[in-house]
């Protein structure tokens, strides 16, 4: 194991009956990083988290924690804690008692418990809430208590299984920022599970995109968004225009009946590829100046931008723009070479 890795998953396979949930999955998780397991329902992300936590056992493969294989170590002996979507707080205990519960089980001296609980209350911005009943708290406050209860035990890794899923959109966005701040203050590893692309892009140092029990791509939010490894990632992370094309040569691609400059190289000459263009990367120009040209067939106001469909003989293009366009009008679309992303063509996708 490399010195900066805290967890290694090596060839993890897990099945339930005839259904393979994880298929020979391997993953390195670094110390002090915020890593997100992202994917649709049933992709294996929560099962991966449970295997790390010790709540599930892999059929084969190794879970390595700080150079030690921990497959047979029970959850309560692993140096990590888990926060679930259902916070499982004790309703008969107040905020202080909930946070202190794990420390009391370990028979930590009362003065140290008091010190640690106060530190956690400050960390999660709940100072003064010590004596509040759990049921008197908002959803966001309950979540903060659950996080404090997990962190007060000083785990080296915090596992979070869709903890924001039950919150409304405004509170969810606020808690995304708060969670990232907490992780940065503590400097420990967070492993976060979600199906929400915005959550992953907002909080993560590293995103692991999963589908059907396999890792599709692993990288920074910028890499995942700007350079998707395949069609699944391109479609799952944000909105994309995906079209077939031909890589004519290094830095030269043909699609939509036109030839474009691009920044990609290393493909075979005349190789069939797929082109990804994000809707926000199109620029609307006069019809006669367009690299691509078409007719506006739909326009929807999305608040911060309009979503516009432009159709021509080859394709229907989706673009996001702050400018309005009339349905039926003819417009041109312009692209920078950096906005054209080339992917290997996958016949089975």
Curated annotation (Swiss-Prot):
PROSITE patterns linked: ABC_TRANSPORTER_1, ABC_TRANSPORTER_2, POTA
Keyword terms: ATP-binding, Cell membrane, Membrane, Nucleotide-binding, Translocase, Transport
Membrane topology: Peripheral membrane protein
Database matches in SUPFAM superfamilies: MOP-like, P-loop containing nucleoside triphosphate hydrolases
Cellular component, GO annotation: ATP-binding cassette (ABC) transporter complex
Catalytic activity: ATP + H2O + polyamine-[polyamine-binding protein]Side 1 = ADP + phosphate + polyamineSide 2 + [polyamine-binding protein]Side 1
Claim: Cell membrane is one of the keywords in the record: yes
Any one GO molecular-function label of the UniProt entry: ATP hydrolysis activity
Main location, first listed in the record: membrane
Protein localization: Cell membrane
Residues that hold ATP according to the record: 39-46
Assembly notes: The complex is composed of two ATP-binding proteins (PotA), two transmembrane proteins (PotB and PotC) and a solute-binding protein (PotD).
Function: Part of the ABC transporter complex PotABCD involved in spermidine/putrescine import. Responsible for energy coupling to the transport system.
NCBIfam families, A to Z: MMSYN1_0197, potA
Sequence similarity: Belongs to the ABC transporter superfamily. Spermidine/putrescine importer (TC 3.A.1.11.1) family.
Identification of the protein by name: Spermidine/putrescine import ATP-binding protein PotA
Organism in which the protein naturally occurs: Clostridium perfringens (strain SM101 / Type A)
Encoding gene (name): potA
């Amino acid at each position: 194991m490399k010195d900066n890795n805290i967890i290694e998953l090596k060839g993890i396979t897990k099945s339930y009956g005839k259904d393979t949930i994880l298929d020979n999955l391997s993953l390195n998780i670094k110390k002090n990083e915020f890593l997100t397991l992202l994917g649709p329902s049933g992709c294996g992300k929560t099962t991966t988290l449970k295997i790390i936590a010790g709540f599930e056992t892999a059929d084969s493969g190794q879970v390595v924690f700080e150079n030690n294989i921990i497959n047979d170590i029970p959850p309560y002996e692993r140096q990590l804690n888990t926060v679930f979507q259902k916070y499982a707080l004790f309703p008969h205990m107040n905020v202080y008692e909930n946070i202190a519960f794990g420390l009391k089980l370990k028979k930590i001296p009362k003065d140290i418990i008091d010190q640690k609980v106060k530190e956690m209350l400050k960390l999660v911005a709940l100072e003064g809430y010590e004596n509040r009943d759990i049921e008197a708290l908002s959803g966001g406050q309950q979540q903060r208590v659950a996080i404090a209860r997990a962190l007060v035990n000083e785990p080296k890794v915090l596992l979070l299984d869709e903890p924001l899923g039950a919150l409304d959109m405004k509170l969810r966005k606020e808690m995304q920022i708060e969670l990232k701040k907490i992780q940065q203050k503590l400097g420990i590893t967070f492993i976060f599970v979600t199906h929400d692309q915005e959550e992953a892009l907002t909080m993560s140092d590293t995103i692991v995109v999963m589908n059907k029990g396999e890792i599709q791509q692993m990288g920074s939010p910028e890499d995942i968004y700007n350079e998707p490894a395949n069609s699944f990632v391109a479609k799952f992370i944000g909105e994309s225009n995906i079209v077939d094309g031909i890589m004519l040569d290094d830095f030269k691609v043909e699609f939509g009946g036109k030839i474009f400059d691009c920044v990609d190289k290393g493909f075979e000459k005349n190789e069939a590829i797929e082109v990804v263009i994000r809707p926000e990367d199109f620029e609307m120009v006069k019809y006669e100046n367009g690299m691509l040209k078409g007719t506006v067939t739909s326009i929807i106001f999305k608040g911060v931008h309009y979503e516009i469909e432009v159709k021509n003989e080859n394709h229907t293009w989706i673009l996001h723009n702050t400018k309005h366009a009339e349905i039926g009008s003819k417009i041109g679309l312009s692209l920078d070479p950096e906005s054209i992303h080339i992917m290997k063509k996958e016949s089975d996708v």
